[in-house]
Design a protein with these regions (language model features):
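Switch/connector loops and helix/strand junctions flanking conserved nucleotide-binding motifs
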Residues: 1-4, 271-274, 304-310
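A short beta-strand-to-loop transition that corresponds to the Sensor-1 phosphate-sensing loop
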Residues: 1-4, 147, 266, 298-303
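Phosphate-binding site recognition
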Residues: 1-220, 235
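Conserved catalytic cores of phosphodiester-cleaving nucleases, focusing on short active-site segments
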Residues: 228, 250-267, 281
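Domain-level recognition of nuclease-like catalytic cores that cleave nucleotide substrates
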Residues: 286, 292-316
Length: 316
């Protein structure tokens, strides 16, 4: 068995990076009829269906210069089921993953990381000193960028299926322990936004936070930020939730077909201060040429009441 000492780990080699997935080239050639059939079933054009599949199942990179690959399990399930759903998480989120995140005190906002070395995530389980190797090797995180100068990697969620599935799995630890309550808040909030009833959305959010106020007791500002991070990012299953831009970002930017909502949140501050920060930091600038209505929402969280104290809504 001396040969076993000479095994070579090829998992980070560019030439093998697409061996376990389906590439865009394969999807648009060999599987093109399947994409067309799925698009017909969903009332989407070929290009629209391709984009939905990309957002939900693409995005895996397993080396420095890897091409994008799709999750084959979910992609094939989508073709067979004629629906774009979260199939991978339907198979169950391992309890040991959640326990590992708790063991290593991983905050949900810090799961996506920048500036890590290969030794931080491409190691065997017995050498783990953080949850990063487990998250990467089990497919919850993937390589998003590589910087040759520092030989560092940026890791992040590969796609919407994984991001939303992970956040839904973690939500009961921070929000209501009853998943249906959390999902109900998110879908109702989004419905209010589509109806352009931002007052209704904020009142619904305030009532929800009041209903879980016992879970918000003895929480600090960081915990408050985590709660809002989860709520707004869970909306990414239904609407576009913006990521950080070159000039920074507001706490939440939600894009609908005709309107863009920019939220800034304060903890024991004032809603006016929140609006002022949106203007001072230029959070609206990236969206001024979008042709959509811009709406600013300044929100203040009252730690004594353990819910939203006030909010102010203004057109951009």
């Amino acid at each position: 068995f001396s040969e076993l000492n000479n095994l070579e780990n090829i998992s980070m080699f560019d030439q093998y990076s697409a061996i376990c997935g389906i590439s865009m080239t394969e999807l648009t050639s060999v599987m093109k009829p399947d994409v067309e059939g799925l698009g017909d079933a969903l009332g989407l054009t070929y290009d629209e269906c391709l984009e939905e599949l990309r957002l939900y199942y693409d995005g895996y990179h397993f080396s420095k210069h890897s091409e994008d690959v799709f999750n084959p399990f979910s992609l094939i399930r989508a073709m067979n089921g004629q629906a774009i759903e979260s199939y991978w998480f339907g198979s169950g989120t391992p309890s040991y993953l959640i326990k590992s995140l708790q063991k290593y005190h991983v905050n949900v906002m810090d799961i996506e990381t920048k500036g890590v070395t290969i030794d931080d995530f491409d190691v065997s389980p017995e050498q783990m000193t953080s949850a990063l190797p487990l998250l990467y090797q089990s497919g919850y995180l993937t390589i998003k960028a590589y910087k040759p100068l520092t030989k560092s990697y940026q890791l992040g969620y590969p796609n919407n299926e994984v991001r939303i599935g992970m956040l839904r799995s973690l939500a009961p630890n921070y929000l209501s322990p009853v998943s249906i309550d959390n999902n109900g808040l998110v879908t109702e909030f989004v419905d209010f936004l589509y109806d352009e009833n931002i007052e209704g959305a904020m009142n619904r959010l305030k009532a929800y936070l009041s209903s879980i106020s016992n879970r918000l007791s003895n929480k600090n500002e960081r915990d408050f930020q985590t709660v809002f991070y989860l709520i707004f990012n869970l909306m990414g299953a239904f609407i576009k939730v913006e990521e950080e831009s070159a000039i920074g970002r507001a706490d939440a930017v939600l894009q609908l077909p005709n309107t863009i909502y920019v939220f800034e949140l304060k903890y024991d501050g004032s809603a006016e201060d929140a609006l002022r920060q949106i203007d001072d930091k230029g959070y609206l600038i990236p969206y001024t040429a979008s042709g959509k209505k811009l709406v600013k929402v300044g929100v203040n969280y009252d730690s004594d009441q353990r819910t939203i104290g006030e909010w102010i809504i203004r057109k951009g």
